[in-house]
Amino acid sequence: MFIADDVYGAIDNVAWYRQCYLRKEFEKCIEYSDKLYAVSEEMCELYEQRFNKPVEVLYKGCDLSTEPKGFLNEPIKIVYAGNLYYGRDDTLAELAKALEKINSTKTVAKLEIYTGATITSEIERKLNIVGSSEIMGSRPYNEIKEIMKNADIVLHVESFEEKQKELVKYSFSTKIIDCLQSGNVVLGIGPSNIASIEYLKKIDGAFVIDDMDNIFDSISKILNEKNYIKRKCKKGLVNFAKENHELTVVREKLKEDLTTMCKGKSNESVAN
C-alpha cells in the first residue's frame, strides 16, 4: 500500500456520518497490507505512530540518462511547472515582484509559469509582469521536460499561509523529482516544517528560501552567483539525484521488496 497524502487525517473534514465508516475501511487497508510505503519521511513517521506498523519511504524515480546543459541563458530562465493550488500563486507572486525590482535597470532573470490551472483576472494581474514573469499556459509532459531541461533554475513553491501549510505538511510533490530530472539548479520557496521544503534542504544542489521577508535579498544573491549556479548543479544536485532517484535504483528496490514478500508468502504456504 502506498500513502501519497494524509488521507486518514483528512477524514476529519468529511461529513460526520461518514467518518466512522471511512476510518474503519482505511484501517482495514492498513491491517491487510504486507508492506506500507509513504511519499515522504514525515508521512512515514506519522503513519507509524498512528498504526504501529513500519512504513518505508518510496520516491518517484527519474531518468538521468541525458547530461545537463553546461551554460546559462541570458537572462537567467526560472521555470515553474505545476498547479497554483494551496496558495502557491501567492508565493509565485512574491517572487515575481522581487524579480521586477531586480530587473528595474537591467533584465537579469525571468520567471516562466507553466500551468493548467484556471487563470482568473487576479492571478493574471499578480503573475503577468512584463519583462519579469509570464504565465505560459499548459504543455504536454514531454514538452515540459524539455522546457525544464533548458531552464537555468527550476522552481518548487509552497504557501506561507497557516491553513495551506497544514494541508501540505506531510505531502511530497512529485514535481520535485521532475526538477531533479532536469539537471538544473532547484530553488524551493516555502516555510520550514513542510515535507517538500525540508527535503530540498538536504540536497547540496538546491537553494531554499524559507522566509518570505528575505525573498528579495535571497534571490538577488542567487542570481549574482552565476558560476556557482553551474558548479552547484553539476556536483551536488546531479549526484544526489543519481543516488536517490535514478529510475533503475527505485525499480530495483521495489523489485527486491516484492520478491522478499513473495518468498515470505510462499514459505508460509509450505509451513501450513
Question: For each predicted feature, which ranges?
Answer:
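A short, histidine- and acid-enriched strand-loop-helix "catalytic/donor-clamping" loop
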Residues: 1-16
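Membrane-proximal helix-turn-helix segments that form the acceptor-binding/catalytic region
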Residues: 7, 17-36
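Carbohydrate-associated surface elements
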Residues: 42, 60-61
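Conserved donor-binding/catalytic core segment of Leloir-type glycosyltransferases
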Residues: 71-92, 96-99
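Nucleotide-sugar-dependent
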Residues: 87-90, 142-146, 154-177, 186-198
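Nucleotide-activated donor-binding/catalytic signature segment of Leloir-type glycosyltransferases, i.e.
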Residues: 106, 115, 120-150
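A charged, aromatic-enriched C-terminal amphipathic alpha-helix characteristic of glycosyltransferases
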Residues: 210-217, 227-259
